[in-house]
């Protein structure tokens, strides 16, 4: 009896220790079961993802273009991350004592990757569900999709595509629960406890960040939708709420501009927006340049001299026509097609991609006004309404989205822009190589193919110089035998300039430009047809008589001598002065240089015509057409203003601007003589 009592007392004293040991064993068992559940479910999850990406997606190619990208989003990225994560989980099995600690560190290692891949998928999930609902409204398509799913995974049931699409969302939200289960069965003094605790908190933060990102994307999607609305539809959307909101924002903006209230400043966003606007300007400039280049290319291809009959049988001319025809039909056509598909179309897509962020930036400015107003009210009153709090959070979400996404967007646009420029350069180089290859066989037949490039350049310059001299001689010969060219009317507003040149240099030095002159050198002038200049020297510094030094009254420079005609003022006779009350301006008519050849000339008489069309704005004015002859009754209005002239045309009288009129010569019928 004494021994039995001693054993009983001993068993009672050992029972608390045994209970503690049993509790630890149960916790360890539950921990290992939780770890086993984590690994087994990860294996099943990855298998389902691969099945969805391979068997199901590959058999849904009959869906409209682009739908597969929306349905399955970045599932390939999720598979890649999950594969590496599962491999890491399986490697922890060989170190059973440290397995819980290794799993906690593994989750911390994959924290950022989980957030990056799952936030994209979760943000696109709602759009994928909209597509699934749209497919359900088409019985034949839905039946075909259901057959594909049942063949791949019979346990999916009637839920169809939505069964697979929701799996990644369920998995990322289950990670914190699985970690929490492992953590609960890990002693607080165990070495794995801190790592598991950090991992659980990190995965909870990941889910919170994903939800916040999804909310931002929903706000962005709301304001990036481009709606093509007519004016009637836009007016129909205006209501009292819209007017009140616009008025409040305008009032807030005016108070900020006046300095009555403060404005929220965000230096980080301002820098990003400036960068975005600069990138947008680069895209716009490049697009305009490509448009001009393609237009010039079309003009270049429209000229086809090889299709003309040159009347030069055989020789280099025939070889050139053959080469030009080959380039026109093959090399240039291929270059044009590649330019459109590889440069123009991507550039247009890039320009369209800028519209969404641009709309978000504009909408952010509106939301910033609402935010500042709510913040001001919150400081004054201490509380805001539910709608005002929602507007406040909407601005914060929109601003956070832009600050987070604009740097990456700007970088991608610059990379895209650089690729387009590189492609354009490569296309130019390929075209040059094609032209050289096609010209090699023809070049061997040309008379100067054996000449070196420097010698060929000298030969080319010499030939062009000779041709230019011959053309100049031909031009001078034709100018001597041709009748005098038609006198050009004076440019509007050039009368005072002509008077100054006449006073300074005299009538014998006055010349009028017979055709437009485009200066190409640093000392060359660009002049318009009809402009009056004064001759300073009839040759240039090298003694070339074909270039004259002239004065326009403001600038001095060289112009081609062949484009100048000598002019003298024509003084109207007393009869003409009596026949007209006055003229608005003195007119200067050309007198051709006397030539040695006897050429019949046509006598001319002075005539006042409208140089430009004029539309009357009142009953006191007279409408005129360009070139319409008029009779000047008074060279000023009733107040003596010479800028208006009273004229008569077609039996009607009225005032017209004086600088719209010019005196031009008109041929006199043969046999008539001007009165002496």
Swiss-Prot record:
SMART domains: BAR, RhoGEF, SH3
GO CC terms of this entry: cytoplasm
Domain DH: 30-213
Pfam families recorded: BAR, RhoGEF, SH3_2, SH3_9
Residues annotated as domain BAR: 254-455
GO molecular function: guanyl-nucleotide exchange factor activity
Function: May act as a guanine nucleotide exchange factor (GEF).
PANTHER family: NUCLEAR FUSION PROTEIN FUS2 (PTHR22834), RHO GUANINE NUCLEOTIDE EXCHANGE FACTOR 37 (PTHR22834:SF9)
Entry protein name: Rho guanine nucleotide exchange factor 37
Organism: Mus musculus (Mouse)
